[in-house]
Amino acid sequence: MTNIRKKHPLLKILNEAFVDLPAPSNISSWWNFGSLLGICLMIQILTGLFLAMHYTSDTSTAFSSVTHICRDVNYGWLIRYMHANGASMFFICLFLHVGRGMYYGSYLFMETWNIGIVLLFAMMATAFMGYVLPWGQMSFWGATVITNLLSAIPYIGTTLVEWIWGGFSVDKATLTRFFAFHFILPFIVTALVVVHLLFLHETGSNNPTGINSDADKIPFHPYYTIKDFLGVLILLTVLMILVLFFPDILGDPDNYTPANPLNTPAHIKPEWYFLFAYAILRSIPNKLGGVLALILSILILAALPLVHTSKQRALTFRPFTQALFWILVANLLILTWIGGQPVEHPFIMIGQAASISYFTIIVILMPMAGVIEDSLLKFTH
């Protein structure tokens, strides 16, 4: 008798995705982040669901309802901080996952990669709207500043902003719709994740050598289920250390002050995981130019397959491009730092230099390095 997991219509799909899936025998811990992102998504949906049971999306009660969750609801403080810090862990895993894809040339799986970019945008939209919900000072002013950027769109900009606000400023209507969108988007993300996996399983996973691994495959279970479980254990340990010992370390103190439209905070800034993009936005003195640069800072990932010049897929055996990759990582850390600094000398200049080098490395230097490496290795184009 054949095992039920291979016969049952539903179990068969799960079996082919998580049990009998042929996986390369040499994928490293950098391939753990996909499953970690899945765990993060599950944590966020569950904690978010329980928060939504006690949260009210009205401007007069939103801040109080979050306070009520932390003080009066059983383990409400735990759920709230798991959700807030879970978002940070989500983005850490996300950045490492994308970085892995860039390093090992996984972007050559075009469909999987492009769905991943759509996922990244959806995640950023979800996180931004979630940050508005507690209705603290940074929630309100962050929402005002970021939504206002749409007014830079020629002709329809102002109308579009007022349409999103549901009025002439960020107010009750804005908060209510942001709550609605914040609730629905994670489920859209989940659907996109399924499509992401569907396309990945069409080709199979890439591996650290960047070479076809069809000749040497092993079953996903038990090898990678146990390996992923270790990753999950580390993720949960780090998350719980954050939640139980340093719950506010990644937040902004301004968000413990209720939203006040008459009082602007000294430095309006988003959550840490958006600071690199915020720095790129601020480095351009023109409003529309800044918005375009902001979008391009993520959308440029879609250009990676187009500017891949090397005959080799991964950076494993390509020292020049490797060096450029790590310079790019350092550059992103500099942008993150600059995004949290006030707009004054010398931060303006550093931000502009880092923004220019960010795009230059990806679009010009890395493709050039690929061509140089090929010629040095006598790979004829």
Swiss-Prot record:
Subunit (UniProt): The cytochrome bc1 complex contains 11 subunits: 3 respiratory subunits (MT-CYB, CYC1 and UQCRFS1), 2 core proteins (UQCRC1 and UQCRC2) and 6 low-molecular weight proteins (UQCRH/QCR6, UQCRB/QCR7, UQCRQ/QCR8, UQCR10/QCR9, UQCR11/QCR10 and a cleavage product of UQCRFS1). This cytochrome bc1 complex then forms a dimer.
One cellular component term from this protein's GO annotations in UniProt: mitochondrial inner membrane
Cofactor(s) the protein requires to work: heme b
Gene3D superfamilies per record: Cytochrome Bc1 Complex, Chain C (1.20.810.10)
Gene: MT-CYB
The protein's role, per its UniProt record: Component of the ubiquinol-cytochrome c reductase complex (complex III or cytochrome b-c1 complex) that is part of the mitochondrial respiratory chain. The b-c1 complex mediates electron transfer from ubiquinol to cytochrome c. Contributes to the generation of a proton gradient across the mitochondrial membrane that is then used for ATP synthesis.
Species classification: Eukaryota, Metazoa, Chordata, Craniata, Vertebrata
Extra information: Heme 1 (or BL or b562) is low-potential and absorbs at about 562 nm, and heme 2 (or BH or b566) is high-potential and absorbs at about 566 nm.
Cofactor details (free text): Binds 2 heme b groups non-covalently.
SUPFAM superfamilies noted in UniProt: a domain/subunit of cytochrome bc1 complex (Ubiquinol-cytochrome c reductase) (SSF81648), Transmembrane di-heme cytochromes (SSF81342)
UniProt-annotated binding residues for a ubiquinone: H201
Single GO term (MF): metal ion binding
Residues annotated for heme b b562 binding in this entry: H83, H182
Location(s) in or outside the cell: Mitochondrion inner membrane
Natural source organism: Scotinomys xerampelinus (Chiriqui brown mouse)
Full protein name: Cytochrome b
Alphabetized UniProt keyword annotations: Electron transport, Heme, Iron, Membrane, Metal-binding, Mitochondrion, Mitochondrion inner membrane, Respiratory chain, Transmembrane, Transmembrane helix, Transport, Ubiquinone
Pfam family, one: Cytochrom_B_C
Biological processes annotated in GO: mitochondrial electron transport, ubiquinol to cytochrome c
Family annotation (InterPro entries): Cyt_b/b6_C (IPR005798), Cyt_b/b6_C_sf (IPR036150), Cyt_b/b6_N (IPR005797), Cytb/b6-like_sf (IPR027387), Cytochrome_b (IPR030689), Cytochrome_b_C_euk/bac (IPR048260), Cytochrome_b_N_euk/bac (IPR048259), Di-haem_cyt_TM (IPR016174)
Family in the record: Belongs to the cytochrome b family.
UniProt KW Membrane keyword: yes
